[in-house]
């Protein structure tokens, strides 16, 4: 199998697998006071220290979650619940991940004021529109660091500075960015930052929410775990694997980023030569090293995706969380693409274990299969 869908889930690193196996043998509950519980608590504390160190944060600022979707819910609902009277509004960019955007729509249906800020053709937010949108009623601004479909990097420090001037908090979804580019909550100016393990070689179902000291979040569910900020017994194997993977990803970031960027460049340039009219979504904007969102002219993206899959090549039509939807990508639509253009787009994403052979296989297969899916399926009927 040629795997080119690392933005959905990247394979677990050996260090993470080893950490998960070891943690599975720790049977105690971290909340218990006996010896087995203390052993579990020690593993939890050490894992928290490792994640905090990788983020340049303090352990007390890290809350473990089941992933970015839960983390976003804790952050958004918690921020609204703890906001001062009169601050009930949520502002977010038009290209946020569904875990943020869909929750905002649910809140809007319940009466919470929600404002969506447009982006330009590159996928970058309109800062003038954002400046107009954020006001004295705004409790929370949501701006992702790197878009999951296009890889475009958003100007989070500028957004954070604007939010701070208006007295609003900033939630930054750093899920795609962590382990690939520096994620320093202090430098970003964020108040809340999301990461999740499966994007940098950790296990699925384990994530972390960084909370700036002094930021109050109302509890979303009853339970004393994670200093009262996230209820439920902690997933120790997942947390241990998350910590191990993030530590390794950060330590090897420069080396892996350079290699991945070179592979992406080879993929993009090779396909541009072989496919006349190919377009790169997000061109002209800073991007992650491993994501290429490519628009194939006059193509049925789903048909091309299926053809690739039948040859053992795994790619994506966009966010894994919205695969199977008949609606065009909200990200590409926000960037000004027509429904047909959005449906002609495939996302190829590379990761820590991608190799040159993966790219060369795609360069051979994509143009050939594109010609096949464009060809008529039957001969014309006689007149």
Question: Model-found features: residue ranges?
Answer:
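Pyridoxal 5′-phosphate
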Residues: 1-383
